[in-house]
């Protein structure tokens, strides 16, 4: 079967031919319809320091997808041939304390699809049936293919009660924009998103986010004053991993504010910890999606009217995968979809 693989320890992704994976007793065989390119895939393409430490070569990459069940392991129940599915990309052990306690997303033995085991940039994917999620009929293939990053956005945004709250989102990448859209959809009062990339801020506006701030040109505190905010933000969603953005968030949080962090800053990032202590801030780290509460919420948000379609900006056939990676690497894209049909 055709697959996109990391074949060499250098920059690039290559189309290759690999065997169709074998289905285990507890697995599903999924025929891939559409995949989306993640920022993680770009890191792997670029062969940066993280990738060099993490990715075994060769490796079929990719973890954002939708497909059709075409094979079922003999121990699997609850799925039928023809079911349309996406799936949780974190394969958990099932026997650690967190797994047994129902906190599966915190499994210390997690393996990543397309990172530690073969991924979805292929004609077929084998996945434990436990990890598969059936896609409702009224959700399109395009939207289903981005459930993985949408789940990151939902998990981050819904970490705290947002109704009537003022929310700051730092980082207008696709996940940050989707998190801002979720906050607005569920009843936040003012939702402000910051970045230095004007293309991404315009994309946020297309997604219905009114208050977009280019911090290279505008002062965030001036925007807050124009909105009549006198006490700071109640909730911060840090999606950028940029130290200046996190420091600005700490400066503008209200006392008792709550921050969810999905962006990954440099390990040597320094902050003024007195702002955390004396403001009584609560900071929560976010990794992946809650299994599977986040997945049900994703479907419900779309079914209740949340429109994510503007976040998908580019579509290519799988044979044009290089154009897709070029678009993602340019910084001038939202989500990029690759069709395998």
UniProtKB/Swiss-Prot annotation:
Gene expressing this chain: tdh
Chain's role: Catalyzes the NAD(+)-dependent oxidation of L-threonine to 2-amino-3-ketobutyrate.
Pathway given in the UniProt record: Amino-acid degradation; L-threonine degradation via oxydo-reductase pathway; glycine from L-threonine: step 1/2
UniProt subunit comment: Homotetramer.
Binding-site list for NAD(+): 175, 195, 200, 262-264, 286-287
Note describing how the cofactor binds: Binds 2 Zn(2+) ions per subunit.
Cited SUPFAM superfamilies: GroES-like, NAD(P)-binding Rossmann-fold domains
Matches recorded under InterPro entries: ADH-like_C, ADH-like_N, ADH_Zn_CS, GroES-like_sf, L-Threonine_3-DHase, NAD(P)-bd_dom_sf, PKS_ER, Zn_alcohol_dh
GO CC, alphabetical: cytoplasm
Site entry: Important for catalytic activity for the proton relay mechanism but does not participate directly in the coordination of zinc atom: 148
Catalytic reaction annotation: L-threonine + NAD(+) = (2S)-2-amino-3-oxobutanoate + NADH + H(+)
Family membership noted in the UniProt record: Belongs to the zinc-containing alcohol dehydrogenase family.
GO molecular function annotations of the record: L-threonine 3-dehydrogenase activity; zinc ion binding
EC numbers: 1.1.1.103
List of residues binding Zn(2+) 1: 38, 63-64
Top-level lineage group: Bacteria
Annotated GO biological process: L-threonine catabolic process to glycine
NCBIfam families, sorted: PRK05396.1 (NF003808), tdh (TIGR00692)
A Pfam family recorded for this sequence: ADH_zinc_N
Active site as annotated: 40, 43
PANTHER family in UniProt: L-THREONINE 3-DEHYDROGENASE
Residues where Zn(2+) 2 binds: 93, 96, 99, 107
Location of this chain's protein in the cell: Cytoplasm
Protein name, as recorded: L-threonine 3-dehydrogenase
Keywords from the named record: Cytoplasm, Metal-binding, NAD, Oxidoreductase, Zinc
The UniProt record lists the keyword Signal: no
Listed cofactors: Zn(2+)
């Amino acid at each position: 079967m055709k697959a996109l693989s990391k074949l060499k320890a250098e920059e690039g992704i290559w189309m290759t031919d690999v065997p169709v994976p074998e289905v285990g007793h507890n697995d599903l065989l999924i025929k891939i319809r559409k995949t989306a390119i993640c920022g993680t895939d770009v890191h792997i393409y670029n062969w940066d320091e993280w990738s060099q430490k993490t990715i075994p070569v060769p490796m079929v990459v990719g973890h954002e997808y939708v497909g059709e069940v075409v094979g079922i392991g003999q121990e699997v129940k609850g799925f039928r041939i023809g079911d349309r599915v996406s799936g949780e990309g974190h394969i958990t052990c099932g026997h650690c304390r967190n797994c047994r306690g129902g906190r599966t997303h915190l499994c210390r033995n997690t393996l990543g699809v397309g990172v530690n085991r073969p991924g979805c940039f292929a004609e077929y994917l084998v996945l434990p049936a436990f990890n598969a999620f059936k896609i409702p009929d009224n959700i399109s293939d395009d939207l289903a293919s981005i459930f993985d990053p949408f789940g990151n956005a939902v998990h981050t945004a819904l970490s705290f009660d947002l109704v009537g709250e003022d929310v700051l989102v730092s980082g207008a990448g696709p996940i940050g924009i989707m998190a801002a859209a979720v906050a607005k959809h569920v009843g936040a009062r003012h939702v402000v998103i910051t970045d230095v990339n004007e293309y991404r801020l315009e994309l946020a506006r297309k997604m219905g986010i009114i208050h977009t701030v280019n911090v290279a040109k505008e002062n965030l505190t001036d925007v807050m004053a124009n909105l009549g905010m006198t006490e700071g933000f109640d909730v911060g969603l840090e999606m950028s991993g940029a130290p200046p953005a996190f420091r600005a968030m700490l400066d503008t949080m209200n006392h008792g504010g709550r921050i969810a962090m999905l962006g990954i800053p440099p390990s040597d990032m320094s902050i003024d910890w007195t702002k955390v202590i004396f403001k009584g801030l609560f900071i929560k780290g976010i990794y992946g999606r809650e299994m599977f509460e986040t997945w049900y919420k994703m479907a419900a948000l779309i079914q209740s009217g949340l429109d994510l379609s503007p976040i998908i900006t580019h579509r290519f056939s799988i044979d044009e995968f290089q154009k897709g990676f070029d678009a993602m690497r340019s910084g001038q894209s939202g989500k990029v979809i690759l069709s395998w049909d």
